Every structure is written in C-alpha cells, then in structure tokens.
Amino acid sequence: QQLYVCARLVSFLREVEKEDGIQPGKSVMIVPTAIGASMNEGSRLWEPENMDINRRFPGDPAGSTTERITDALLERVKNYRYGVQLTSFYQPGSFVPHVRMMDTGRQNPDLGCEFGLPYVYVRTPRDYDQTTLNYNWQLCGTQAYSLYAGKTREIDEAAADQSLRAIVRFLNSRGVIRSETAPGHASAIITNADMTSVSATSAGLLRRVKFAGA
C-alpha cells in the first residue's frame, strides 16, 4: 500500500512539474523504500538480522547493516522542513487513514490537520519509540508526520486515494506545490488519553461486525 501511494505521488508530481506547479525554491524528495530486498521477500523486516528498520534510528555509520542504512537515510532527509513517512504497522489490521506524530515537545499537530484526514494522533513515546524515524526526524528539526495509509500487505484503492489527496493537500497548504485540491476533513487532534483497547472477555470465534471507518 505504501509503495503504491508513493508511485502515484511520483506520477502526480511529474505532471505538476510539467505545468510549473512546483513553487520556486521548493523541492520534494521521495524515498519509496529503504530496503528493496525485504519488500521482494514480502517482509517488513531486514531478513539477515530479522530487524525492523524503524527501530534502528538514529543509526550508526559504523554499526550493523540496518544502523548504517538508517544513519544514511536520516542524513539525507534531516534538513527538510517537512517530512511525511508512509508507515506500515507491526500488527495486522486496517486503519482509517490518519496522521500520527510523537510527542517530543517539538511536534506541531495543528500543521498535521492540514492533511485533512479525520484525526491527528499525538502519541506519548515509550522507550522503544525513541528509535523510530518520526521521533528522530523531529529531533533533527523537521516537522515529521507519520501517515497511516489504511493497510500494509495489500492495496486498498479507496484508502490510497484518500492518502494521496492528503499529501497533495498538505504540500499545497505549505506552499510547496500549486495544484487544485478538494477540501478535507476538519481533523480532530487526539492523544493517548482518547485511546481505548477493547479485548474479548472469553475465548471463541471472532465475527467482525464493525470495520474501520464504517
């Protein structure tokens, strides 16, 4: 799903560029994937080390393979004013497309509302969150946002459309590109205090009666 949204964004921005829609002095860099080999194997982990690359930031130029990759990636992107990460999730499931960011003291959730998605989730980081791209990107001075695009292992066209429109809307709002965009949602800003875990009270078969966004 994330690679598909990136591919569509590249195609869209090529057309914008042909029409001189990239604003003077602005640029957009797109990194579809950091480790193509893992995608070829259908895994979100770096297989030789069985490591989640998003738990290896800020990286180490003299460290393991994943640490060298994350160090090089962060060096390339840390000087951008805004950053959008199309995030996969470590657990199976589906999401209403939304924006997340870590509470680092440097986050700006009001800017996150400019994506026009239903909600912006400001998450209180746990210790292991301090090794993620979003957390370390913010510490570098970038307004970094994680965009959850619906699914991970399969393409959801409706969620991909919504995610693409959200990114274009944000780029337009921030004066990076000039393009017509439809208005989005009036985003709600939520925190950990608004989240609830729902667990079954007994064992048995699960029949789903509610779906994300329905």
Where are these regions (language model features)?
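Structured catalytic-domain cores with a bias toward divalent-metal coordination
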Residues: 1-214
